[in-house]
């Protein structure tokens, strides 16, 4: 080998060593940025976990409250049915009493009229009979007033049932919203798992290649550029493992290059 060839080989070797050091500096810079991203992603993940746990707790509490409301609603519905049945029974009894009272009143008036016609009772006796009739009518009016009070009470209970049904609808809507948010979180988790599996496969491919292959460095840079904007902990962790592996392989190579240059 001539001196000129040897000199060109030395220059080429130095150029390769300088290029390797430059790539190493870039990789270390990317490592620092990735570590920052990992730290931020970890903090964000912890915050999201805390929020999710809080939402799950709220969801459990509201589910428990919803079950209580369902139990209360069923009890009120049974009570309302019983009240409606009792109201119908009382109305029927009231109608029967009114009908019976009307018949008795008509029969009583007829008997009084016949008695007066037969025995010519004085007007004072007529007044006493009329007073008795008024007392009976007043008693019937009191009974009717009591029935109207019971009907108003049943209407009030029906209003409470409507308010509970409205509250139930609001809780069901909130439950549906929480279920949608939980589905979104599960989809994100599934996507992160798929990306992690892909990176594991890529890591196996890298280990099968020669550890000093510059193509590994270029591929790693492309992977870092591709995922450096991602905000997922699994991606950053996989890239960190690859970078550490390449760094541990390339660092011992520099002293060998320096020894070659000195020889």
UniProtKB/Swiss-Prot annotation:
Keywords attached to this entry: Cell projection, Coiled coil, Cytoplasm
InterPro entries: CCDC172
Localization, UniProt: Cytoplasm; Cell projection, Cilium
Cellular-component GO terms for this entry: cytoplasm; sperm midpiece
Tissue: Detected in spermatozoa (at protein level). Predominantly expressed in testis and in spermatozoa from the caput and corpus epididymis.
Coiled coil segments of this chain: 13-191
Subunit structure: May interact with TEKT2.
Similarity field: Belongs to the CCDC172 family.
Protein name: Coiled-coil domain-containing protein 172
Gene: Ccdc172
């Amino acid at each position: 080998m001539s001196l000129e060839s040897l000199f060109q080989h030395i220059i080429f070797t130095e150029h390769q060593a300088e290029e390797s050091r430059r790539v190493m500096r870039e990789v270390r810079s990317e490592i620092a940025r990735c570590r920052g991203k990992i730290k931020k992603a970890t903090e964000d993940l912890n915050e999201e976990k805390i929020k999710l746990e809080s939402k799950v707790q709220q969801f459990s509490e509201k589910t428990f409250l919803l079950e209580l409301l369902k139990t209360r609603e069923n009890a009120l519905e049974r009570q309302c049915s019983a009240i409606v049945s009792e109201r119908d029974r009382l109305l029927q009894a009231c109608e029967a009493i009114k009908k019976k009272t009307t018949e008795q009143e008509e029969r009583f008036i007829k008997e009084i009229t016949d008695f007066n016609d037969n025995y010519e009772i004085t007007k004072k006796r007529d007044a006493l009979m009329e007073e008795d009739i008024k007392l009976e009518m007043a008693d019937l009016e009191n009974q009717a007033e009591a029935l109207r009070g019971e009907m108003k009470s049943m209407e009030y209970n029906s209003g409470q049932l409507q308010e509970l049904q409205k509250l139930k609808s609001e809780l069901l809507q909130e439950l549906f919203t929480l279920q949608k948010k939980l589905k979104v979180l599960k989809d994100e988790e599934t996507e992160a798992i798929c990306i992690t599996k892909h990176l594991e496969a890529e890591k196996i491919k890298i280990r099968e290649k020669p550890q000093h292959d510059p193509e590994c460095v270029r591929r790693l840079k492309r992977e870092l550029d591709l995922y450096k904007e991602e905000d997922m902990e699994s991606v950053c962790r996989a890239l960190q493992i690859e970078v550490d592996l390449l760094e541990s392989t390339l660092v011992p190579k520099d002293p060998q290059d320096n020894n070659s240059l000195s020889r």
